[in-house]
Amino acid sequence: MFCIQCEQTIRTPAGNGCSYSQGMCGKLAATSDLQDLLIYMLQGVSVYAVKAREQGIIDAEIDSFVPKAFFSTLTNVNFDDERIMAYAQQAAHYRAQLKASYEAACEQAGIAVEQVPQVAQLVLGTSKIEMLAQAPIALLNKDKHDVHEDIMGLRLLCLYGLKGAAAYMEHARVLGQTDADVAGRFHEIMSFLGEPSVDGDKLFTTAMDIGQLNYRIMAMLDAGETQAFGHPEPTVVNTKSVKGKAILVSGHDMKDLELILEQTVGKGINVFTHGEMLPALAYPAFKKYPHLVGNYGSAWQNQQQEFANFPGAVVMTSNCIIDPNVGSYSDRIFTRSIVGWPGVVHIEGDDFSAVIDKALALEGFIYDEIPHTITIGFARNALMAAAPAVVENVKSGAIKHFFLVGGCDGDKADRSYFTELAKSTPKDSLILTLGCGKYKFNKLEFGDINGIPRLLDVGQCNDAYSAIQLAIALAEVFECDINELPLSLVLSWFEQKAIVVLLTLLSLGVKNIRTGPTPPAFLTANLAKILEEKFGLRNTTTVEADLKTMLNVA
């Protein structure tokens, strides 16, 4: 086992990364090894997808499968060995299918079949024992003694960034958004990473290419969400419990939320969002469901307590899931899509009757809590609608600075930095937030500036796209570069989606971003120095010191 993809990975003087019997996330060594083998098989599929494309062969089914299966290897997504093995076996089937199509096309065209790298040649074992025996070939640091640590760090930066992009591709696909060119570029990068490179410049360029690719993917996801559900609008949301039977929907998949809402109409069940599903409450399409009553709980890391206290059924539509046995709710939590946990019921297809039956059998909330509301829904359209008023307030001096504070949440004590930063921002500044990092401060009162709320909840982590659009619009109005705006970006990172959002921002030329609370363990000190020199990227320090720098206070 070797896994170093998230913030909670083991860090010791002897080396970083989880490499024992179990990772800090709860992932067993066997699961980690099977995930590495799955990635290896997917890279082999991409090798042949690239070759097939050269002969004009595009398989949309395979284009959709590879990022979806890759998504299953993200932090806190799928812990079910049987499901991971099934993905690997499906990958082997698709690779053989593409290989046959490619070779037939070459024969018909009268050209030689090109040799493929080792990553596209492995004959996958048929049992768990056989697959685990093959896993060392796919170990991410298998050649760590032969290559420089900076090269290893760049490889992992690319791999983990592409994982984040794969997740967004799958979210977009669920909403009907696919693009053959995007899929083609994705396969090219997967294929490249399947042949471990020692070219630092090429790896760095690839990291920026992944950022650019993800910008296109985020635009696709934005289109999918707004076409399906309308543009988010400022919305007041209750964050307290409501009396009645209950279902809690966590993750990111709004299509699943829609299906659950449709299937619970008239059944006397209240539906609550959780975590990154909170932004769904701002979409017009969901406002026609009066039994979508609010948001319950906070960010992913608190789920073992929050789900244990929730008196209904819980559905995990995507990341992040953690051990449901700790809170003794494994019999009433259900997984969807790429999510998996051994022993937990997995919902295939679009029938949520098992979830509904479980909710009806449980007690539900026995009384209404006193409501506490927050305002959400400041995504792209709402931000653009507010832009003229924002510009006027900037020109008048009422608004002097913008902060984007968001990203992933986590349970480290030093994440209180983000709470204190938000509380310490000047009263003449606006705070944009997104991702589950918002839960560090989104229930606090920040007031407004001439009717414009100081705290603007942009949405899910992928809605960084909305924030980018606002920054571009403001830069055009003020006839300046984005980096010349009075804008400071402070991103909390935990896993691979945050990595690819960061790569997207860097690839767009956005500079002087702060990330925290701790730097990724796979980034060497030298790589961190290069990123700081090239982009001004730096780690958070103290709220007082960082604010002085961001506000140019001597």
From Swiss-Prot:
Residue list for modification Cysteine persulfide: 408
**Cell location:** Cytoplasm
What GO terms in the biological process aspect are recorded for it?
response to hydrogen peroxide
Q: Where does hybrid [4Fe-2O-2S] cluster bind?
A: 252, 276, 320, 408, 436, 461, 495, 497
Q: Does the keyword Iron-sulfur apply?
A: yes
The cross-references to InterPro entries, in alphabetical order and at most eight, read:
HCP/CODH, Hydroxylam_reduct, Prismane-like_a/b-sand, Prismane-like_sf, Prismane_a-bundle
Q: What Pfam families has UniProt attached to this entry? A: Prismane
Q: Which UniProt keywords apply?
A: 2Fe-2S, Cytoplasm, Iron, Iron-sulfur, Metal-binding, Oxidoreductase
GO molecular function (one): hydroxylamine reductase activity
Q: Which reaction does it catalyse?
A: A + NH4(+) + H2O = hydroxylamine + AH2 + H(+)
Q: Which domain of life is it from?
A: Bacteria
EC number(s) stated in the UniProt entry for this protein = 1.7.99.1
UniProt xrefs under PANTHER family: HYDROXYLAMINE REDUCTASE
Report the function annotation for this chain.
Catalyzes the reduction of hydroxylamine to form NH(3) and H(2)O.
Q: Which family does it belong to?
A: Belongs to the HCP family.
- Name of the protein: Hydroxylamine reductase
